[in-house]
Structures are given as C-alpha cells and as structure tokens.
Regions:
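Flexible "arm" and connector segments at domain edges
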Residues: 2-130
Length: 130
C-alpha cells in the first residue's frame, strides 16, 4: 500500500471489545475508505481488490517455499515470521474485498459472523458424526 498518513485517526477502542477485534475492523474500514477515495468503487476496482487476495496468497505460498527450502536454487530463504506476515496480509486483503462487495465494513462484519456461525454448526455436526 501507499502512504497512509492521510488516513483519519483510528477510532478509540471500546472497553467491552477485545482490542484486536476492534483494530482489525477499524483498519479494514479505514483502508476501504482510503481506497474508495483514491480509486472509486467501480467494477474494475472491485476486481482489483479481489485479485489482491490472489497476489497475497501467492506471496504466502512463496514464503512457505522459502521456509521449507523447496526451491533448490534458493534454499531456505524465508522464516516463519515472513510466512505469518504474508498469511495476515491474505486475511486483510480478503476482509477488504469482503467489505467492498458487501457494501461496507458493518455488513462485512455481520456476514462474516453469520458465516462463521454456520460453519461452527457444520463442524459440530461433522465431529458428532465421526
């Protein structure tokens, strides 16, 4: 990303919510607002935000290859922190794309919560059947 010094200040943390949770969604909201102001939100920009997930996924894969030394030309060229950082970038890119296609961060947060709840029910059923 480019210079973020023009972003508005982060919202203060609510006492009843975990700091990480608030910071993630606050960061997503601020990033989406910044991207919307800079690039708009036409179909092309939406596609670019979706492609960003694939780009970050490729970087995570490259970090894993570097971590395991699977490329004999490079050997071990990455550490665990690089892999973790790239995986975090995948998550952030996905949340930004989710907020873009759902119409905003509150909608994305709600959809993700419902999706996780649905997956939890499914996992419970799968575990009970095992």
């Amino acid at each position: 990303m480019s210079d973020t010094s023009t972003l508005p200040p982060a919202a203060p943390l609510a006492e009843e919510e975990p700091a990480l949770y608030v910071c993630v969604w606050d960061h997503v909201a601020r990033t989406v607002a910044w991207l919307d102001a800079a690039n708009g939100r036409d179909p092309h920009e939406t596609a670019v935000r979706l492609m960003k997930i694939a780009e970050e996924t490729g970087e995570a894969v490259a970090a894993y290859i570097g971590l395991t030394g699977a490329n004999p030309c490079k050997g071990v060229s990455a550490g665990p922190d690089e892999l973790v950082g790239e995986l975090c970038d995948v998550v952030l890119a996905a949340l930004i794309a989710l907020a873009t296609v759902t119409g905003g961060t509150p909608q994305a947060e709600s959809r993700l919560a419902r999706h996780v709840a649905d997956r939890a029910v499914r996992l419970r059923a799968l575990r009970a059947a095992a």
